[in-house]
Structures are given as structure tokens and as C-alpha cells.
From Swiss-Prot:
Domain of life: Bacteria
Class in the EC hierarchy, top level: hydrolase
Gene Ontology terms for molecular function: undecaprenyl-diphosphatase activity
UniProt source species: Cupriavidus necator (strain ATCC 17699 / DSM 428 / KCTC 22496 / NCIMB 10442 / H16 / Stanier 337)
Pfam families in the cross-refs: BacA
Protein name (record): Undecaprenyl-diphosphatase
Amino acid sequence: MEIALALKAVILGIVEGLTEFLPISSTGHLILAGQLLDFNDEKGKIFEIVIQFGAILAVCWEFRARIGNVVRGLRAEPLAQRFAANVVIASVPAIVLAFIFGKWIKAHLFNPISVALAFIVGGVVILLAEWRDARRGTVSHPQGNALLEAAKAGAPRIESVDDLNWRDALKVGLAQCFALVPGTSRSGATIIGGMLFGLSRQVATEFSFFLAIPVIFGATVYELYKARALLNGDDLGIFAVGFVFAFLSAFLCVRWLLRFVATHDFKPFAWYRIAFGIVVLLTAYSGLVSWHA
């Protein structure tokens, strides 16, 4: 295994793990990182699929107890059945639109300039959502008489993933459709969409994690099947390196984010998105970085 290639695998694995579940777009970062590292050929595309699989397995491991309880309760427990149904309902819209428009999106939007614009627009949307949240006087855990005041002010009406109904799940699923545009961020679309539809920040974040499992897992299996002719045993070493680093970095990131959202908003991510998008546009038009589609 070439050291330079292994280093690229490590970097891209970490980039995937750290960005997959933050509202900053893993796809956007991978497109840009792939351009900089000159690792965006057919092998690079397959590599991205593999490291995404590593990242989603980290979520499965973090929530293994909850997933196990849901699976065991599917036969007889209404709560588990409703939870599973909500995940399926929320997954359908994006899957359908991806099937219809997937080829067009890849042909026209998978380039650094489009990604940079999506970064900026997404950052502005997050700021507007947080501004709206603050203006409504939202509190995370109202108690006593504050409960009535919070309700009047428009506080989140859903404080637990188990309180979601199918309409809530469908709304979050529709929000997830915006993530088909590279640079938008799947987690950002589902979390901010969830908050706008009445979920607390913590519930929106947790449901976003669970929603990622069928969506990313299904996309991974489908893309690997399509690229099966390009799979080569000689690449297993590089794929394994990227997979491991994506898994580890994603696992740490998920744990950190769950703690972060308990006491912070998403404004730092919004400003990061805007700044990063502007930097990409400026370097592209000034010629400092040779971004190419």
C-alpha cells in the first residue's frame, strides 16, 4: 500500500466521520477534499461509498440498545412499531426523489461551485431557523407555570422521539429531500426541518441519527451494487483504512453532538458553512485553488 494513498484514505475517512452527522454536509466536504487530494476518480467514488458505510455503522453501534429494543418489540409493542413506521415514512420521500432525479443531480450539481453555494444558502437557513427559535422564546425543558408560557411562546411540542406521529415523521422526511442537493447536508436538513416543525433540538438531532441508518445504508448497498464491476481486491487495504477511520471519527462525533445540542444552538455551524462557502468561491474565482467540476 502506498503511503501517500493511505494518507489520503485516513484524511478522507476522518472528513467523512466528522461531517456526516454535523449540519455541514459530508458530501460537500468529500467533493472538495477529493478535488484537493486528486482522489475523485472512479476508485475515489467507490471509496466514498465505503467510508459512508463506516460512518453509519458508528451510529448503529452508539444506538445499538435502542435499535435492539425496537427490533425485539416489532411483533407486539406499539411504541416500537410506531417508531419503526416513523423511520420508514420519513425515509420514503428522499428515496423516491433520489431515484427520479439522482442522475441529473450527479451530472449537474456535483461540483465545487454548486457545493459552495449550497453551503452558503444552508448556513443562512440555519441562522434564520435559530433566529425564529429564539424569537419564539423557545425553552428546552419548561417546568411548572413556565410550561404554559412556553407553549404560548411556541416552544417545541415534541420533547421525545417516542412522541413523534406519522405526520411529524413525514414532514421531517420532506425536509430531508433538500439534502439531495450536494452541500446542503442531510443532517442539517432533517434537524432544522424538525425544529421548524415543532421538534426540540435534541429530538430533531436524535431522530436525524436514526433516519440516517436506512437512507445511507440503502444508498450504500445500491451504489456498491452498481459499481460492482469496478471493485478490485487490490483496493481492499485502502478501503479498510478509510472505513476504520470513518467509523472511529463518526462515533466520537455522534457522542459529542448529543452533548453539544443539550446546551448549544447551531449558529456556529451556520457561520462555518457561510465562511467555508465564501472561501471556496473566492479561491475558485481568484485562481488560488484549481477547483474543477
